[in-house]
Regions:
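Domain-level signal for soluble alpha/beta catalytic cores
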Residues: 4-182
Length: 182
């Protein structure tokens, strides 16, 4: 786990926290998460019906600015804008072959927001994942094992990018949630 700690030292080198320091950080009693990223991006120009991940990569300053505002408002955790960055959702936009590059770059934007923020506080980045929009077999055609692999793939890219932890959110199916955490 590469957990960024107060971003850089006086030499400009990135500083990382240990597992014990991470556990102490989350045990402090409360963590303030960032806000409603999708709706705030729409207020700042992201049209409906586009691939949010692609739009953010085309307009990185919008996301970085929004996340800097969250930090300055007191957020301890930024969600990387990887909400629907799984292979199935990206395939809807013809972007499945870019899953690794997109997830790494999107997480990197959150780290950039931390670097640019005017704070001495430690801020963490969570890799954010959600449902695929596909129904699992026998209701749908998606085998459970394939769904596990889809989530493992996205999580793997987020871990490569250095996120501090993974958030699984907005799941409508207990089985899909289970696949994401396996």
């Amino acid at each position: 786990m590469k957990t960024l700690k107060n971003t850089c030292n006086e030499k400009g080198e990135e500083i990382y926290m240990t597992r014990k320091e991470f556990q102490e950080f989350i045990a402090k009693g409360k963590m303030i998460l960032d806000g409603a990223t999708g709706s705030n991006l729409q207020k700042r120009g992201m049209p409906t019906g586009v691939c949010p991940e692609e739009w953010i990569l085309e307009h990185p300053d919008v996301l970085v600015g929004l996340q800097r505002e969250y930090i300055e408002a007191g957020s301890d955790v930024l969600y990387a804008p990887t909400f629907s960055g799984n292979r199935i959702k990206l395939e809807e936009y013809g972007l499945a072959d870019q899953i690794g590059e997109m997830n790494r770059k999107l997480a990197g934007l959150s780290f950039e927001a931390i670097r640019q923020a005017d704070t001495d506080r430690q801020v963490l980045v969570a890799g954010d994942i959600t449902m695929t929009g596909q129904q699992l077999y026998p209701v749908g055609n998606l085998p459970f094992e394939e769904l596990v692999d889809i989530y493992k793939e996205q999580i793997g890219y987020l871990v490569e990018a250095g996120v501090d932890f993974i958030v699984v959110e907005t799941m409508m199916s207990l089985h899909e949630c289970r696949a994401a955490v396996l």
